[in-house]
Amino acid sequence: MEGWRISHLNEHKHERTIYVDADACPVKDEILSVASQFQIPVTFIASYEHFQTKRSPLEDWRFVDTHKEAADLVIANSVAAHDIVVTQDIGLASLLLPRQVIVLSERGRMYTNETIDFDLERRHVSSKQRRKGVYGKGPKKLLEEDKKRFIAQLQKILSNHEGFLN
């Protein structure tokens, strides 16, 4: 009976997944490439306006309404500890970090518990400036070196968490 209980519990073990806030994500192909190296499933969350078909057996697409927080809510309700989320949304990152989710920007920057308060403060200051009519240049164009940094960081995360060596 004891052996049954152990195997029964193992059947319900969570499989690590990469979730992608996909509407404006410029590194979808890079995510799929790295995920295939590690055989990690990827779930892309996007609005119906960004409908895509599946290109790999490791990928899954979930489509949501066009409401600006719809994808964030699906991601927040789907993730488990040690899953990986790729997003540029600092607010979403701040919700996921306390749940032991690994959060990575599209440029390869990891959001951490140590840096998230600063990121939120910077976002707040920028928002106040925009309300006053002061607009910055916006984000810099994503360069090939940014994509390489992202790939290296995702490979490092998966290597460390899957027991592989760099």
From Swiss-Prot:
Pfam families in UniProt: DUF188
InterPro entries (UniProt xref): UPF0178 (IPR003791)
Family in the record: Belongs to the UPF0178 family.
Full protein name: UPF0178 protein BPUM_2255
Gene source species: Bacillus pumilus (strain SAFR-032)
